[in-house]
Curated annotation (Swiss-Prot):
Record-listed E.C. numbers: 3.2.1.8
GO biological process, one term: xylan catabolic process
Protein name from the UniProt record: Probable endo-1,4-beta-xylanase C
Main subcellular location of this protein, as a coarse class: secreted
Length: 326
């Protein structure tokens, strides 16, 4: 009877501690610690209340990653669904979680054509949109002033040919919306790094990559306070991209830093992941990497199995390969 009681107690303790075992295992080989030892600022991931309140997912975040990006909770539809009526429950959760666990924060995102409430999309008056844009940026950034390392001020504003996307912001304000957004952001939090962020910036000779670099170079020459370019780096398998060369092209625009901001790779091969990590290590202005999620279970590309942990939160070969490479 005593032996059965002891066994039952052991099983109960083991079950209750499953998350902490994961945490202890990963803490011994933290990607963030290894990456920072190479001179970089962070190796991070994204999350929000749903994933961060999953104890197994959270244990890995706490042990392995040094930075957090809100996946959805800071986007316009979440923070200002109706004009002048702000909602910060989800964003507050992430910021408080990050502060409690010593994680840097990348704010994402202030100006984006997608996940944009209809009331914003319907604005046609230049003065009205300017006022709305300034108020939104000011209100969101002011709430988290001093707590956010970097902000994606504008997101996905380029077409694949390197021209500017025809969003409500461009249609009403023209290219000037970029200046308005960055100048407002700088005035609210002068210490935060201000980024422009986009996808398909993975080949140096691609029109979108060159268009981004050329526009940013011009905007900086005009005094627009752009500190960094974020390359989302959502990749297919097989390495038909030149991330290192692309990062160098982006860095040549005159920004003080670049970052890989939303990394995931279809199939999550060890070779592909190590190549991307080495690309950032090889570019002096590349300050960090953010993978777009912890586990395939919660990935927006779950069918592609693109992350470093499988659906059961077990580290993949790519995880171990990165640790070995670092």
């Amino acid at each position: 009877m005593v032996r059965l009681t002891v066994l039952a107690g052991f099983l109960l303790t083991s079950a209750a501690c499953s998350a902490c075992v994961i945490g202890e295992r990963q803490a011994a080989s933290s990607i963030n610690n290894a990456f920072k030892a190479k001179g970089k600022k962070y190796f991070g991931t994204c999350g929000d209340q749903g994933t961060l309140s999953d104890s197994t997912n959270s244990a890995i975040v706490k042990a392995d990653f040094g930075q957090l990006t809100p996946e959805n909770s800071m986007k316009w539809d979440a923070t200002e669904p109706n004009r002048g009526q702000f909602s910060f429950g989800g964003a507050d959760y992430l910021v408080n979680y990050a502060a409690s666990n010593g994680k840097m924060i990348r704010g994402h995102t202030l100006v984006w054509h997608s996940q944009l409430p209809g009331w914003v999309q319907g604005i046609t008056d230049k003065n009205t949109l300017t006022s709305v844009l300034k108020n939104h940026i000011t209100t969101v950034m002011q709430r988290y002033k001093g707590k956010v390392y970097a902000w994606d001020v504008v997101n996905e504003i380029f077409n694949e040919d390197g021209s500017l996307r025809k969003s409500v912001f461009y249609n009403v304000l023209g290219e000037d919306f970029v200046r308005i957004a960055f100048e407002t952001a700088r005035s609210v939090d002068p210490q935060a790094k201000l980024y422009i962020n986009d996808y398909n910036l993975d080949n140096a000779n691609y029109a979108k990559t060159k268009g981004m670099a050329d526009h940013v170079r011009k905007w900086i020459s005009q005094g627009i306070p752009i500190d960094g370019i974020g390359s989302q780096t959502h990749l297919g398998s097989g390495g038909s991209w030149t991330v290192k060369d692309a990062l160098n092209t982006l860095a040549s625009s005159g920004v003080s830093e670049v970052a890989i901001t939303e990394l995931d790779i279809a199939g999550a091969s060890s070779t592909d992941y190590v190549n991307v990590v080495n690309a950032c290590l090889s570019v002096s202005k590349c300050v960090g990497i953010t993978v777009w999620g912890v586990s395939d279970k919660y990935s927006w590309r779950s069918n592609d199995k693109p992350l470093l942990f499988d659906s059961n939160f077990q580290p993949k070969a790519a995880y171990n390969a990165i640790i070995s490479a670092l």
